[in-house]
Design a protein with these regions (language model features):
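C-terminal regulatory/interaction module of P-loop NTP-utilizing enzymes
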Residues: 1-299
Length: 299
């Protein structure tokens, strides 16, 4: 059941270990209440995809994921015909014995994620995750417009398949290119930023409960300072969690310069970034973090 208030939605998502920012909570709530797609844009690793996954668990709905990539077409995204089965039918019936109505049937139709999402089940309409739309070609966006506008797909040989109840749609983009305005207008939009220190601490305590409170504080504040550096790719929330878990595996109860340097590849994924931060720069950031935490304790 969809939450009655924004606060209730935030609390429900938190019980599933997803911490919503205030802005994202409002956007998600409105998208659910108004049955509009939610377009989430932001850096990789900030938790956009997890919104759909967590929502599926919360509402006990099927999650249908369409992972976008360059060259994605209708056959992979929406439907295709079972040509092998059609050929067998033709061979069995004899040449010229079957017409289009005999061959282009529901039984010969192979459903891909977009078409599958238009079919609900006993649990209700599914959640459709269109992940990393910016990786797909612009032509694919045009195809999505009919679905997002009318909740239907037109199949030339078969007819129009319409949803009895619209799916819950979450679209994500890492903004490697701009998505066309025509598609954005059909959605509610939210930019997913890196979480605040307190929100990221909350996330880390939920996702890495084995890490002690002091270690979590160090990890989060170190990562936040790292994001202020001129890096090719700043670490996301996923990297924060991975780093805390890695440090626990190494029996670290606190970060020191040696452990920071030896595990930098968990946080950063480009050699130029690692080379720039490792050593004196990591030690400087760590000193700033320790000074900040000492100030909190003194206060």
């Amino acid at each position: 059941m969809i939450s009655a208030t924004v606060a209730e939605l935030s609390e429900s998502m938190a019980r599933e270990d997803y911490v919503l920012s205030d802005g994202l909570a409002v956007s998600l709530f409105l998208a659910l209440r108004k049955q509009r797609p939610l377009f989430l844009e932001g850096e990789a690793g900030v938790g956009k995809t997890e919104v759909a996954k967590t929502l599926a668990k919360l509402l006990d709905r099927r999650l249908i994921r369409l992972q976008c990539y360059e060259g994605l077409d209708i056959n992979a995204a929406a439907y295709e015909w079972n040509y092998a089965r059609q050929m067998m039918q033709i061979q069995s019936a004899g040449q010229g014995q079957l017409g289009n109505d005999d061959l282009f049937t529901l039984e010969n139709l192979i459903e891909r994620p977009l078409l599958e999402a238009l079919r609900d089940d006993k649990k209700g309409a599914p959640i459709l995750l269109i992940d990393e739309l910016d990786r797909a070609d612009e032509a694919f966006e045009a195809y999505l417009l009919e679905i997002l506008s009318d909740w239907q797909i037109t199949i030339p040989e078969f007819g129009t398949v319409a949803a009895t109840a619209p799916p819950i749609v979450i679209i994500t983009s890492n903004r490697t290119r701009e998505i066309h305005d025509a598609l954005k207008r059909r959605c509610f939009y939210h930019w997913v930023d890196y979480p605040s220190v307190q929100n990221e601490l909350d996330i880390l305590r939920r996702k890495a409960p084995e890490a002690g409170a002091a270690l979590c504080e160090q990890v989060v504040r170190f990562v936040h300072r790292l994001r202020d550096e001129s890096l090719f790719k700043a670490p996301g929330v996923a990297e924060t969690i991975d780093w805390a878990q890695a440090l626990v595996e190494l029996d670290c109860v606190a970060i020191d310069p040696a452990s920071a340097d030896s595990t930098m590849g968990v946080l950063l994924k480009y050699q130029d970034d690692i080379a720039r931060i490792s050593g004196s720069e990591a030690a400087r950031i760590l000193t700033e973090v320790q000074t900040e935490l000492s100030g909190f304790k003194a206060g």
